[in-house]
Amino acid sequence: RYGERTQLEFDALVYHAVALSGVTGRRPRIGLLGTASGDPQWFSYRAIEAGRVAGFDVSTLDLFPMPNHADPAAYLLDQDVVWVNGGSVANLLAVWQVHDLEPAFRAAWAAGVVLAGVSAGSICWFDGGCTDSFGPDLRAVTNGLGLLPYGNGVHYDSEERRRPTIHALVGDGTLGVTHCTD
């Protein structure tokens, strides 16, 4: 959302992720990944500016057209929070697989880096969920990173087709226990 002096202002969820990191005495480091929407530079610039105003050091790990860090795994480990934006979870997971980032995310998670995000950036940490990545009809995605061994039903209340789709996917066994959020 727009801030008082910026074109983007972080919401409470970002501040919560930073609080979970436990950082004190220095500016928290937030690594922003916009893979799910093709690493849009305009959003990265706005997020970096919003971070400056909020007292955070925000940087990006871009994978389009090629990684902007020589060692993405080291970059992830150097963050306090890794924040993944929304977009196409199917494309996000495919690009991460091609770049072999799953071990890097697992290492960051094991090291205590807070892994967070919204929409596609939330589903990715779970076993899967339902997505419109393939078109207007919602479909299952079941190849999430599985750091949280559950399904994830994003937009559960705000998009009327999400709830019945998640219920059907849990009912037919495509997804196991599923946590839903909005």
Q: Where do the model's predicted regions map?
A:
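Flexible, glycine-rich phosphate/dinucleotide-binding loops
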Residues: 39, 67, 124
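Active-site metal-binding loops of divalent metal-dependent hydrolases
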Residues: 36, 88, 120
